[in-house]
UniProtKB/Swiss-Prot annotation:
Keywords: Ribonucleoprotein, Ribosomal protein, RNA-binding, rRNA-binding. The keyword Metal-binding does not apply. One of the primary rRNA binding proteins, it binds directly to 16S rRNA where it nucleates assembly of the body of the 30S subunit. With S5 and S12 plays an important role in translational accuracy. This is Small ribosomal subunit protein uS4. InterPro entries: Ribosomal_uS4, Ribosomal_uS4_bac-type, Ribosomal_uS4_CS, Ribosomal_uS4_N, S4_RNA-bd, S4_RNA-bd_sf. Residues 91-157 form the S4 RNA-binding domain. Part of the 30S ribosomal subunit. Contacts protein S5. The interaction surface between S4 and S5 is involved in control of translational fidelity. The gene is rpsD.
Length: 201
C-alpha cells in the first residue's frame, strides 16, 4: 500500500502539529525553515478544511485514495460521519499496535505489521490497514517476542497511556480490543467536521 515516506517533521511544521508523537525536532522549532518561519497566509475556510484533512492523512499515514475510501465508508455508516471517520482510522491494525505501546511511532507499527509479527484471533495478518473489531485478540508471534523491538516494548510498556478501549497484557504483549473507540477516547488533534465539510462540497 502506498504511503508518504518523506520527512515527517517538515509536515508537522507545515501543519503546526506534531504528527509523529514525541518529535523533539518539532518541539524545538514548530515552524517551517527560514529566518522568520512561515510567511503569514490568509486562512480561508477551504485552507482550514484542507489542513485538517492533511493532518489526519499524515497522522495515520494514509494517502488520498484510501483516505477518501475511508470517508465514503464513514458516510455510509449510521451516526456522525466525522466520528465514524476517526473510528475507522483508529481501528487500523498499525494504529492499534501504536496505541497499545508496542511501537514508538505509527510508522514503526506499520513496519512491524508488514513484516508479519502479529496474529489477529490466531491468524497471521500483515496488512497495516486491517480493521480490528470488538473482542479481537492481537498477539505477537512467539518467535518475534525475542526480537529487539518487542524486548524494548516489554521494557517500556506503560510509559504511554493506553486508551480505555484497548487492554495490553504485559507478559506476552497481547492486545485485547474491548470495543471500537468513541470520539471522546480519540485524542488525535483533528477537527473532523472540517474534513466532512471539505468532502461534502
Amino acid at each position: 500500500m502506498a504511503r508518504y515516506t518523506g520527512p515527517a517533521t517538515r509536515k508537522s511544521r507545515r501543519l503546526k502539529v506534531d504528527l509523529v508523537g514525541g518529535d523533539q525536532a518539532f518541539e524545538r522549532r514548530p515552524y517551517p525553515p527560514g529566518q522568520h518561519g512561515r510567511a503569514r497566509i490568509k486562512e480561508t475556510e477551504y485552507l482550514l478544511q484542507l489542513q485538517e484533512k492533511q493532518k489526519a492523512k499524515f497522522t495515520y499515514g494514509v494517502l488520498e485514495r484510501q483516505f477518501r475510501s475511508y470517508y465514503e465508508e464513514a458516510n455510509r455508516r449510521p451516526g456522525k460521519t466525522g466520528d465514524n471517520l476517526l473510528q475507522v482510522l483508529e481501528c487500523r491494525l498499525d494504529n492499534v499496535v501504536y496505541r497499545a505501546g508496542l511501537a514508538r511511532t505509527r510508522r514503526m507499527a506499520r513496519q512491524l505489521v508488514s513484516h508479519g509479527h502479529f496474529t489477529v484471533n490466531g491468524k497471521k495478518v500483515n496488512i497495516p490497514s486491517y480493521q480490528v473489531s470488538k473482542w479481537d485478540i492481537i498477539d505477537v508471534k512467539q518467535k518475534s517476542l525475542g526480537t529487539t523491538p518487542f524486548i524494548i516494548a516489554k521494557e517500556t510498556i506503560g510509559e504511554r497511556p493506553v486508551p480505555a478501549w484497548l487492554q495490553v497484557v504485559p507478559s506476552n504483549l497481547r492486545i485485547l480490543v474491548h470495543q471500537r473507540p468513541e470520539r471522546a477516547q480519540i485524542d488525535t488533534p483533528v477537527t473532523e467536521q472540517l474534513i466532512v465539510e471539505l468532502y461534502s462540497k
